[in-house]
């Protein structure tokens, strides 16, 4: 059985892990980093960059660099207006009242953008394992709705991954934390404040069973919001000083975003930081600089409401779990924003104990996902995970009321049936409107789907018996069915994401993603070949200078001819000619090396020929990389 990788698909950063050698391993990406920015950039020529390469060019390409796409996942157009106002890239209204990212007229769903990030994580794992990866456990915020979970699953499918399980992020963190403590009896609180979302989950584990008692949170509260209060402050300060509005300049706003994130991070370990952005914007034709000192106290004042917003979900989670603060044995901090000192103080004050620093907030969720993957493949035995549904689910009934079938914090998988009837005489059809949320009226909750049950036998109002069944799987994804008990007619719906993507659309996007992955691979191979040629040109020119007149003219000519051919091919990026020119150059050097060896005998020839040839061979076979174990040596001939 192949490996099931664990992926933390984050708002700001993503991380991938795999269970290997009886322990979870966090895998470094091609840039050598253990976390990857959740950023996708589209650059000239159709090339696509993901992760750190995308982040590095964001300032000069703000309108085609996509970040925080997780905040758009599974949401409809009306729910993301606040997010749209914050991002420099173009978001438009697409099919089914959904947000789409517009890149040069091509509309991308949030799932497609997320799939590009997932492809990067998949490739990272494949490079590490040396084998193809097709299965994954992907984490989501505990407070993600059904449609947001479904959208995450679709993103995985588009990326070429079979999503074996969707796991709540705090639950994954608890799995990672408690793996070596699974047979102790403990109650823990996982406080997860990430880049875009906030979750609080209360868990109990013992005897290998991890049971989620309650969960609460806010899917639109996270590090992005803390960055935004700094950005808003800087914009206002510049307006006060210079009378100009930075929000009108996308490039300036991208610089502000990077500076705000950097300042927020620095203020976790320092009491003040300087924000220095030279030439931020011309005012009246004169370049202006933005230089401000931000203290930790000022930042905490700016972010006061955000920090306090974490408190109410904590209270509700504890209340739903039926526990008092003294019942909690350990508090685990997860997510980069949990490093903010004021947040840590709030957690300590609320729970009455110092939070544990025993886990890496940036990696623990991916580690937990890998642990869940190992549980599914039986690499880990004796561990049972009992998660919950974060929000109540029900249907709309007479008078626009929401009637709950499954309450929030119900352990999943779960199944519940209730019998309803018609609201009018001789009614032969009913509409089942499926809702998710905690409010009493249907209009106040999130609509996640609807379907019709037809062919009901005509009868007086209240006589027909219609059995409605809600079935939630282990991923927290819902299936609803309705059955007329008299006729036996039944209709069912598996709630899809609010994106409304059909299987055909998902398959089409998957094919496009695979095609792009192949194009990306070819582009990397092309760059490697160009670098290889560039290295060979440099080494050849260096050795020609060093050898000087020692190299016979009849041997030097073919080397120079092949070198010029390689230079021309490199400039034109003619890959076929590059291959032949490199082969000719190596052949010419080998011929020269052999003759010089024969002429100079065992002393001089043994030094000049093979050394010269080895240099070309290394350049041709190691993609232009120098071998760290090879050192240049100076030789002195003793006569």
Swiss-Prot record:
Residues 600-639 are annotated as: Disordered. CDD domains: ASKHA_NBD_HSP70_DnaK-like. The modification Phosphothreonine is found at residue 197. Pfam families: HSP70 (PF00012). Residues 629-639 have a biased composition (Acidic residues). It comes from the Bacteria. SUPFAM superfamilies: Actin-like ATPase domain (SSF53067), Heat shock protein 70kD (HSP70), C-terminal subdomain (SSF100934), Heat shock protein 70kD (HSP70), peptide-binding domain (SSF100920). Induction: By stress conditions e.g. heat shock. InterPro entries: ATPase_NBD, Chaperone_DnaK, Heat_shock_70_CS, HSP70_C_sf, HSP70_peptide-bd_sf, Hsp_70_fam. One of its GO terms (molecular function) is ATP binding. Residues 613-624 have a biased composition (Low complexity). Keywords: ATP-binding, Chaperone, Nucleotide-binding, Phosphoprotein, Stress response. Belongs to the heat shock protein 70 family. Acts as a chaperone. NCBIfam families: PRK00290.1 (NF001413), PRK05183.1 (NF003520), prok_dnaK (TIGR02350). This is Chaperone protein DnaK.
């Amino acid at each position: 059985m192949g490996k099931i990788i664990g992926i933390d698909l984050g708002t700001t950063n993503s991380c991938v892990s795999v269970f290997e050698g009886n322990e979870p391993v966090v895998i470094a990406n091609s840039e050598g980093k253990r976390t990857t920015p959740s950023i996708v950039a589209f650059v000239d020529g159709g090339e696509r960059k993901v992760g750190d390469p995308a982040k590095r060019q964001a300032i000069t390409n703000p309108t085609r660099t996509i970040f925080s796409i997780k905040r758009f996942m599974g949401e409809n157009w009306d729910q993301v207006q606040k997010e749209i106002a914050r991002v420099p890239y173009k978001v438009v209204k697409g099919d089914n009242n959904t947000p789409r990212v517009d890149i040069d007229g091509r509309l991308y769903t949030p799932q497609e953008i997320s799939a590009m990030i997932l492809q990067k994580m998949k490739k990272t794992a494949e490079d590490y394992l040396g084998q193809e990866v097709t299965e994954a456990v992907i984490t989501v915020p505990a407070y993600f709705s059904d449609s947001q979970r479904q959208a995450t699953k679709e993103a995985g499918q588009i990326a070429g991954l079979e999503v074996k399980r969707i796991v709540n992020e705090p639950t994954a963190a608890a799995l990672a934390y408690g793996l070596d403590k699974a047979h102790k009896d403990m109650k823990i609180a996982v406080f997860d404040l990430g880049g875009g979302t906030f979750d609080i989950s209360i868990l109990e584990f013992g005897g290998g069973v991890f049971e989620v008692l309650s969960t609460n949170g806010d899917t639109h509260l996270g590090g992005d919001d803390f960055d935004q209060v700094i950005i808003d402050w800087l914009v206002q300060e510049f307006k006060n000083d210079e009378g100009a509005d930075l929000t009108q300049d996308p490039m300036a706003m991208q610089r502000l975003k990077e500076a705000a994130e950097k300042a927020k991070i620095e203020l976790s370990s320092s009491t003040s930081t300087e924000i220095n952005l030279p030439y931020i914007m011309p005012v009246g034709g004169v370049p202006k600089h933005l230089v401000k000192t931000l203290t930790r106290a000022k930042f905490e004042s700016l972010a006061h409401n955000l920090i306090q917003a974490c408190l109410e979900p904590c209270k509700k989670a504890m209340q739903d779990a039926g526990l008092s603060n003294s019942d909690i044995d350990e508090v685990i901090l997860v997510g980069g924003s949990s490093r903010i000192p004021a947040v840590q103080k709030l957690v300590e004050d609320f729970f009455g104990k110092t939070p544990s620093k025993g886990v890496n907030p940036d990696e623990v969720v991916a580690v937990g996902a890998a642990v869940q993957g190992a549980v599914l493949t039986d690499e880990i035995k004796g561990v049972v995970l009992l998660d919950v549904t974060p929000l109540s689910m029900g249907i709309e009934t007479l008078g626009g009321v929401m009637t709950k079938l499954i309450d929030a914090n119900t352990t999943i998988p779960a199944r519940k049936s209730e019998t309803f009837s018609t609201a009018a005489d001789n009614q032969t059809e009913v509409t089942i409107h499926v809702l998710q949320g905690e409010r009493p009226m249907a209009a106040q909750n999130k609509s996640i789907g609807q379907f019709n049950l037809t062919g009901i036998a005509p009868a007086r109002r209240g006589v027909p018996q219609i059995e409605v069944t809600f079935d939630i799987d282990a991923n927290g994804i819902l299936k609803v069915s309705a059955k007329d008990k008299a006729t036996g007619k039944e209709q069912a719906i598996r709630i899809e994401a609010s994106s409304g993507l059909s299987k055909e659309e998902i398959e089409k996007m998957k094919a496009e993603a695979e095609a792009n992955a192949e194009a990306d691979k070819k582009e990397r191979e092309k760059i490697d070949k160009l670098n290889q040629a560039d290295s060979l040109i440099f080494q050849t020119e260096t050795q020609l200078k060093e050898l000087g007149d020692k190299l016979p003219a009849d041997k030097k000519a073919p080397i120079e001819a092949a070198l010029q051919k390689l230079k021309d091919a490199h400039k034109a990026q003619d890959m076929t000619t590059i291959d032949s020119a490199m082969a000719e150059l190596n052949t010419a050097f080998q011929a020269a090396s052999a003759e010089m060896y024969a002429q100079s005998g065992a002393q001089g020839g043994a030094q000049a020929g093979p050394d010269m040839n080895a240099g070309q061979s290394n350049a041709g076979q190691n993609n232009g990389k120098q071998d760290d174990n090879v050192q240049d040596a100076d030789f002195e001939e003793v006569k």
